Amino acid sequence: MNATPEKADDLIVVGKIFSVHGVRGEVKVYSFTDPIENLLDYPRWTLRHEGKVKQVELVSGRGSQKGLVVKLKGLEDRDEARLLSGYEICIARSLLPNLAADEYYWYQLVGLKVINQDEHLFGKVDHLLETGANDVMVVKPCAGSLDDRERLLPYTAQCVLAIDLEAGVMRVEWDADF
């Protein structure tokens, strides 16, 4: 394991180590990629947790009932592996595939101001949730918000009218009373 991290502002969180597996240093990983196995396409990860940063290399990985089971280079026993529980798995932003003009990664949406068709500022996108039907944006109030309510808005074509990453704004069709 190498201690030289990527630049912090260039890193995207793509998973999290949540436990150990067996006695040979394997770890259980929750992948934020879709499908979850896509995380295994990235051979080098930057791990972050409570100010600590480590570079690691992927040796192997496989699917399991609750995510992935992964073997990292230099991690040989259960006790070493346990120390990585809770670490976020990050990759360099430049490694992500390019998307079509009307597609966005979740990290690009977080922090956008959300304004409805009546020019009411609802707040900023705090995070997104994956549900069975569609993704849901959690919009939390910010300075200048219409009110102090947290809103859950569907990330659908019917709700999201326009996204301007440069301006930091998302326009939505959503009644202020919902």
UniProtKB/Swiss-Prot annotation:
UniProt keyword terms in alphabetical order: Chaperone, Cytoplasm, Ribosome biogenesis, rRNA processing
Signal peptide range in chain numbering: none
One GO-annotated biological process of the protein: rRNA processing
GO cellular component terms given for this protein: cytoplasm; ribosome
Limits of the PRC barrel domain: 101-178
Subcellular location: Cytoplasm
GO molecular function annotation: ribosome binding
InterPro entries: PRC_barrel-like_sf (IPR011033), PRC_RimM (IPR056792), RimM (IPR011961), RimM_N (IPR002676), RimM_N_sf (IPR036976), Transl_B-barrel_sf (IPR009000)
Recorded domain comment: The PRC barrel domain binds ribosomal protein uS19.
Stored HAMAP family: Ribosome_mat_RimM
NCBIfam families: 16S_RimM
Subunit architecture: Binds ribosomal protein uS19.
Protein family (similarity comment): Belongs to the RimM family.
Role of this protein: An accessory protein needed during the final step in the assembly of 30S ribosomal subunit, possibly for assembly of the head region. Essential for efficient processing of 16S rRNA. May be needed both before and after RbfA during the maturation of 16S rRNA. It has affinity for free ribosomal 30S subunits but not for 70S ribosomes.
Full protein name: Ribosome maturation factor RimM
